From Swiss-Prot:
This is Uncharacterized protein PB7E8.01. Keywords: Secreted, Signal. It comes from Schizosaccharomyces pombe (strain 972 / ATCC 24843) (Fission yeast). Residues 498-541 are annotated as: Disordered. Residues 505-540 have a biased composition (Low complexity). Transmembrane segments: none annotated. One of its GO terms (cellular component) is external side of plasma membrane.
Amino acid sequence: MSLLVKAALILKCASMLQGVSAQYFCRDTTFDKRTLESVRFESECIPTVNKRDLDPNAEGVYKRSFDGNMNPSDFQLLPLAPRDGAIVNVDKESFSKRSTTNMFDFNFSCYFGSDGHSNDTLCQQYIDVADSVGEQFSRVLNLNTPIVIDVTVVGACTGESVCSQGQGMVAGSIGGEASPSREIPMACSDGLTRYYPQAVVKQLGLSDPPSYADSDITIALNADANFYFGSGDMGYEAVDLAYVLFHEITHGLGFSTGWGVFGYENLTDPYMNALLPTVSYVIGEMNGETMYAFHDVIENAFDRNIFYSIDPNEGLPTIAEFFHSVGAAFTLKADSIAGVVAQMNDTTTQFHIQANEAYRKAINPGRLVIYPDAGIDTYSPFIYLDSSYVPFSSGSSLSHVALHHYDCEPNFLMRAFYTAGATLESYIECAYGSDQADVAYGPIGPAMRTVFRRMGYSVNNLTGVTNEYSESLAKRSLSEKPKTAPTGKQLALHPLRRETSILDSTNTTSTNATNTTTTTSSSSTASSSASASSSTSATSGAAGDLFSVSKNLMMTLTAGLCLITASLF
C-alpha cells in the first residue's frame, strides 16, 4: 500500500473517531426558531486539571479518565451533587400570596404572523401569565438565586422558519417544549455521575462553580396555539397558558429523563432498539496496547428516583447502577473488537435477547415508578411514570406521570395530555376536592416536590397556608367540587415522536430523527427536553437488559478496528 493511500485510510479512520472524548462536558440546549426545534450540543464548562495538581482538600470529586496506567492521565474535578433539599417551615399567618419575591426572571422573544412581527400588547399577555406562574413557583421552592428563563413564542410558519407543515417540536404541539439551558455533570454519593440542571446547581453556592449559561431554562411556545390568558371567556378548544407554563417550567427545572431509545444498524438486525442513558467512551493505551473502555454512564438527576420494581422490599438498584456495573468492566483490547462486534450481531446471544426484552418492558405500563425516600414524602409508596406508548415515544415516555392514574389527582400537571377548554383552576378543584390542607401548592403536586427535593431544591411547607388557590376552593360548596376530571378534547402537550422498533411491523426503517444532539462524547436523544424520552422496567433486573450498545459505540469499535487494519499495511 502506498504511503499516500495509507495516510488517506488513517485519516478516514480517524474521522470516524470524532465524537469520542475522555472529558466531561456540560450539555447545552438552545432553540432554533427556523427549524422550530431544540439544538443540543456540549460545552467544556467543567475545568480539567492535571494529575500532579490534585488537591485532596479541594471541593468536589476528581474523576479519572482512565484507570491504572492508562493514558492520557487527565483528571477532572466534578462538583459534588447536592443532598436532598430541605423542607422549610414558613409562618403560615404571614406567608400571604404576595409575600414572596418572584425568583423567576423571564426573557420573552415573540414572533407572530407569517412575517414574524412583534406585537408588544400580545407578548405582554404572555409575560403577565409567566410572572404569575413564577410567583407561585417562588412560594413553593425556597430559592436563593433567581432562575432565568428564555421563552420564545413562535408559530409554525413565522419569519425565518422553514414553514414545514407542522414538523418541529413546537409546531407539532399545543404547548411547546422546555429544557434546562445547561446541564452540569456532578459526582453523586453513590459513585455515579449525573447531569444536574443549572437552575439547581446555582442554588448550591459552590466556591468554585462551573461556568454557567446566560439562562437556566429554555422554553419554546407555539404562537399558533389557542392560548387562554386568564381573563374573559375560555373557548372549548382553548389552552390555559398558565397550565402549559407550569408544566414546561417543571421540565426545565429537571423533571425529565436522560434515557433514550436507540436504533443502530448491524449486520443481522438492522432495526434493533436499545435503551440507555448518555454513555461516554474513551480510547487509550495501556502497556502499549490500544484499549477501548466506557468512560462513564451519565443519566439525569431525575433518573436517580426511578426504579424497576414497585416493591421496595426487593431492594433493586437504580437504572444507572445496573448499567454502570457492566460498563465499569467493559474494557476491550484492540484485538478483541472483531469478536465483540460479531457477538453483538449474533441474534442468538443473550445480549441481543435481553436488549429486545428491555425494549418490550419499556412500553409496558406500570413498570417504572418513582419511589419517594422515607422522610422525603409520605404521599404515596410510589408514583407511576408514563411508559404506555407503543412504539416508544421520546416525546412523552417517562418524563411524565402515568396518564390515567393522575387525571383528577394532585399530580395531574405532569401528565402528557391536556383537556381543551379546562382551566388550571378546574384541575386543582378536581384534584383536591374538599381536602384543602395542601391546596396552597396549587398544581405543583407531591410527585414534583419529591423530585425537586431529590435533586437538591429546598421546598417550603405550605400545608395549611392560605393563598389564592385555597381561597378559590373555599368559596365553592362541596357539591361544586366533584372528583371528576375535566372533560373535553385531549391535546398532547408535546409532539408524539416515534422511534422505529423491531416490535413495530408497520415501520421498516430505523429513524432517530429526533436526535438533534451534536454531543462529542455521548449517545443521547433529545433527552432533557420537555419531550424527553424514557426507559424500561424489569422485575428481574438483569444487568444485560441495559447493556445495550449504541450506534456511537459501534462507530467507535469500527473506527478502532479500521485504524488497526490501516497500521498493518
